[in-house]
Amino acid sequence: MANNRYQGTGRRKTSVARVTLVPGSGKFTINKKDISEYFNFDTLRVIAKEALELTNNAESYDVTVNVKGGGYTGQAGAIRHGVARALLEVDPDYRAELKRAGFLTRDPRKKERKKYGLKKARKSPQFSKR
């Protein structure tokens, strides 16, 4: 019996998404909710589905995601990263176009820490000449 489950882990900021692809009709479930119920904004839904759209697999796989940590934008990016990695398990030939689109690269940008003597990470207190 062939294994029809493909898994990938995606990360972005502080979010971690565990993605499972199963051949099906195109259902997209995030934390046991439908994608339209989980993400209120269309832009986030588009980001999450981008890798599937690029490889023309939007209607051929059911996607189940368990995501935690971070905010909605970070979670959408983590889901995209995880879906792209899972698609590589489906067919390694997708690597070139996924890499070109930048979906396989872990986005290293994180929140910069606040430094003492400053208001925020880089914002300094107002300077007074006299």
UniProtKB/Swiss-Prot annotation:
Which Gene3D superfamilies would you find in this protein's record? 3.30.230.10
Start and end residues of each stretch annotated as Disordered: 102-130
Would you tell me the Gene Ontology cellular component terms?
cytosolic small ribosomal subunit
PROSITE patterns recorded for this chain? RIBOSOMAL_S9
Q: Please name the InterPro entries in this protein's record.
A: Ribosomal_Su5_D2-typ_SF, Ribosomal_uS9, Ribosomal_uS9_bac/plastid, Ribosomal_uS9_CS, Ribsml_uS5_D2-typ_fold_subgr
Q: What's an example Gene Ontology biological process for this entry?
A: translation
Is Ribonucleoprotein tagged as a keyword? yes
Q: Which Pfam families match?
A: Ribosomal_S9 (PF00380)
Please list the residue ranges that the record marks as compositionally biased, kind Basic residues. 111-130
An example of a GO molecular function for this protein is: RNA binding
Keywords of the record: Ribonucleoprotein, Ribosomal protein
UniProt lists the family membership as follows: Belongs to the universal ribosomal protein uS9 family.
NCBIfam families (alphabetical): PRK00132.1
Q: What is this protein called?
A: Small ribosomal subunit protein uS9
Annotated source species: Finegoldia magna (strain ATCC 29328 / DSM 20472 / WAL 2508)
